Regions:
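N-terminal Rossmann-like NAD(P) cofactor-binding subdomain of oxidoreductases
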Residues: 1-217, 257-261, 328-329, 333-339, ...
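Charged docking surfaces used in two-component/phosphorelay signaling
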Residues: 69, 164-372
Length: 372
C-alpha cells in the first residue's frame, strides 16, 4: 500500500485538503501518516475510527519511508527539508503548496484541468516535484482554460482582488477583528440615526485610522480599505505577486518564458476566502459571446459561465456566492471599445482555499496513485 505523509494538515490550506480528502474517500487504499513540526507523538486526526499518532516532521528517516509527501507547511519548511531528503537518497514524490520551489527547473506546477498533459509528461519523464501554483493565477486560468486550449490568448492584463485567506490564517482573523473593532465602537443610535450619514462616515473613517485598529499582520487597515501591494517590492514597479503572473502562467502551460505576456496589479481586499480578477485579454481573433461561453464551459466541469447582465452577475459572480464551492465563475465578458482590436474583458471569481490551494494537491495525489 502506498505510504503517504501529510504535513501542515492543521493549517488553513491543510485543513481544507484534509476535508476534501475525506469527502472524496481519498484515504481508502493509502497508508496515511500525519507529521507535525511541534507535536510529534501527540494525537493526530481520527479517520474511519482510527486515531493517528503524529510523527516528527523534522525526522528525515521517518519522512524517507513515505512514497508520497504532501506538505502545506510553508516555504521555510520546504527549503530546509526537501534538499535534506534528496541528500538522504529519498526517491519519492513531493507535492507542495508553498511557492519556494515553483520555479525550480525540477518542478511541475500542477493545475490538472488546465495542464494535465504537461503533468502526465512530467510523470513519464521522472519528475518527482509537483507544486501548486499561485492562487490568483490558478483561479484565473481555471476560468480561461477554454481560451487557452484553443490557443486564443495573445496577452493578458490581470487586476486581482485578493482575499485575506491568501495571506494566511492570522490575516483572516485580523480582518474579522478589524470589522469587530469598528462595530464595537458604534452604538445602535449612530447606525439608526435618520439624519445625515456624514457623522457616521467620519467616525468610521477615524476608527479605521485609529492606532487601536488591529494591523499587526497586514500592516495597514483592510476593513473599509484596500492594500495596493502584495508580496515584496522588486524595485521595478512590480510586486513579486505581479511578477508571478507571467512567470507562472507560462510555466503552467509549458510555454517558453514570455510566450503569453501577463502583467497587472495585485490588490488585497476585505474578502475572506475568494480571489477575483478583472482581466483584459487580447485574443488572436474575434470571438462572439456564444463562442466564448461554449469554449469556457466545455473546458472542464468546474467553470461556471455567468451571462453579462446585472442580475446574473450580482447573483452568481461574487465571493459571497462562490465561497466554499469548487466552481470558478467567469463573466462580464464584453468587447472593449479600443479601436477594432479583439480585446475583451472578463471577471473571474474562485475560492482561494480550494482550486487556489488544496484541490490541485489532492488531485495530484490521485494522479500519482493511479500511476505508481
Amino acid at each position: 500500500m502506498t505510504q503517504v505523509g501529510i504535513i501542515g494538515w492543521r493549517g488553513m490550506v491543510g485543513s481544507v485538503l484534509l476535508q476534501r480528502m475525506l469527502e472524496e474517500n481519498d484515504f481508502n487504499g493509502i497508508s496515511a501518516h500525519f507529521f507535525s513540526t511541534s507535536s510529534a507523538g501527540g494525537h493526530g486526526p481520527v479517520i474511519d475510527g482510527i486515531r493517528y499518532t503524529l510523527k516528527d516532521a523534522h525526522s528525515i528517516e521517518a519522512l524517507a519511508e513515505m512514497d508520497i509527501i504532501i506538505t502545506c507547511q510553508g516555504g521555510e519548511y520546504t527549503k530546509a527539508i526537501y534538499p535534506a531528503l534528496l541528500e538522504y537518497g529519498w526517491k519519492g514524490y513531493w507535492i507542495d503548496a508553498a511557492s519556494a520551489l515553483r520555479m525550480d527547473e525540477r518542478a511541475c506546477i500542477i493545475l490538472d484541468p488546465v495542464n494535465r498533459k504537461n503533468i502526465d509528461r512530467a510523470v513519464n519523464d521522472g519528475i518527482k516535484l509537483f507544486v501548486g501554483g499561485n492562487c490568483s493565477i490558478t483561479l484565473s486560468l481555471m476560468g480561461l482554460a477554454g481560451l487557452i486550449n484553443a490557443d486564443l490568448i495573445e496577452w493578458m492584463s490581470v487586476m486581482t482582488y485578493q482575499s485575506a485567506s491568501g495571506a494566511g490564517a492570522k490575516h483572516v482573523r485580523e480582518l474579522i477583528a478589524q470589522s469587530a473593532y469598528i462595530s464595537q465602537n458604534l452604538s445602535p443610535d449612530e447606525l439608526e440615526n435618520p439624519g445625515s450619514v456624514l457623522p457616521l462616515v467620519n467616525k468610521v473613517s477615524e476608527l479605521i485610522r485609529s492606532d487601536k485598529m488591529p494591523i499587526d499582520n497586514f500592516g495597514a487597515p483592510l476593513m473599509g480599505s484596500i492594500i495596493p501591494w502584495i508580496d515584496s517590492d522588486l524595485g521595478d514597479g512590480n510586486s513579486r505577486e505581479e511578477w508571478k503572473g507571467e512567470a507562472e502562467t507560462n510555466k503552467i502551460l509549458g510555454l517558453p518564458v514570455g510566450t503569453i505576456p501577463v502583467n497587472g496589479l495585485c490588490i488585497r481586499v476585505g474578502v475572506i476566502r475568494c480571489h477575483s480578477a478583472a482581466i483584459t485579454l487580447k485574443l488572436k481573433r474575434e470571438v462572439s459571446e456564444a463562442e466564448f461561453e461554449a469554449l469556457v464551459t466545455h473546458s472542464h466541469p468546474w467553470v461556471n459561465y455567468v451571462p453579462n447582465n446585472k442580475e446574473a452577475s450580482v447573483a452568481h459572480l461574487t465571493p459571497a456566492h462562490i465561497s466554499g464551492s469548487l466552481q470558478v465563475g467567469i463573466g462580464r465578458f464584453k468587447k472593449m471599445a479600443l479601436n477594432n482590436d479583439p480585446i475583451y474583458s472578463v471577471l473571474t471569481v474562485g475560492d482561494q482555499l480550494l482550486w487556489g490551494a488544496a484541490e490541485p494537491l489532492r488531485r495530484m495525489l490521485n494522479i500519482l496513485l493511479n500511476r505508481i
